[in-house]
Amino acid sequence: MKFISNLLLLSEVFPYFTRGSNIKNKFQIIRSIMFGNSRIVKFTNGINYTIPISLHSLFVNLLQIERYSQIFDLKDSKIEVSFDTQNKFYLSLKLDEEDKRLLALLAYGIVDGAVFLDMEHNTKIINDKVIKIIQGNRSTIETSEGIKFFLDSIGPDSIVETYVRRIHDNYSYDLQNKIVIDAGASIGDTPLYFASKGATVYAFELTKRNYDQMLDNLQLNSSLSKQIIPVNAGVGKDGIIEYNENISKENYDGAASFVVNKYGQNSVKRKVKGMTVKTIIETYSISDVYLLKLDCKGCEYYLKKEELHNIHRLKIEYYSYLKNHKLSDLVKLLKESNFDILIFKHNPNDMGQLGNRGNIVAEKII
């Protein structure tokens, strides 16, 4: 089983071993992966990097950046990276928390067409995939909308999903002066996105870690934060709920679930207040929900038909690896509640089937 697992890890690395690669020690890397050792990568320009086996995804991110960059050089004990020779970013060889997130952000973003600007680059030429990176004592990033985040308080994948891949864009939405309930608000990326479109957002986050980072990021966006009500609570069940939180070193998005534990030895059990959608609507005296967004690792299967009466639209990231929960059951509930639905992949690079993971956009038929 371990051998097969290592083969899968190796398959993630092979695309960067093709002709034209600047990696000197390909066979040594293959051997280290197969035997479960730390990865030492040596580039032809003299840069050497040692990355622990526990940080395999970061290792792949490093290879991605080297492949797509036009500048990848060692400068003052830091790696200088540029994709366009104009905008330059610096990664410490020590890989602290900011560096890890920057590494992942650059890797995920460049694959999806992100345009990265550094702090020195002020341009009026801008598109909706621009992310400006301001490196300093506590680095920040800024989206094309002007929304800011602390670099050490982001989930790189969710930032790319929301502000590069734009998975929440929907031309039929008019969020101005509307109510959004966001279950799985993470570090504040989606609440700030919805608020920038004019919505009032009730932002529910299960984990204390993500919740605290959301509060940090809201402080950077004082105007938009007035439209956001952050709540440290799980959505789906009332009362105190026990959940499983992923505490692996590569879990930048703070993944957690009260429905299933798929994190194994990398998980820890914690407790938090839980609220059903019905309780949320009653507690906050919400009469009309324009959009219910669910990205909560299984809580979508706890929706009840009677909770959907005053909800006009849903945006659900669903998971079907859960025992006793099927995508077909969720689809049936929505259709019986008079919703028109569309199912799609939110990540075109995801090799899995739609039956396992995807997005549902639902709109009530009038």
Task: State each model region's role.
Residues 1-366:
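Phosphate/nucleotide-binding beta-alpha loop and adjacent structural elements of enzyme active sites
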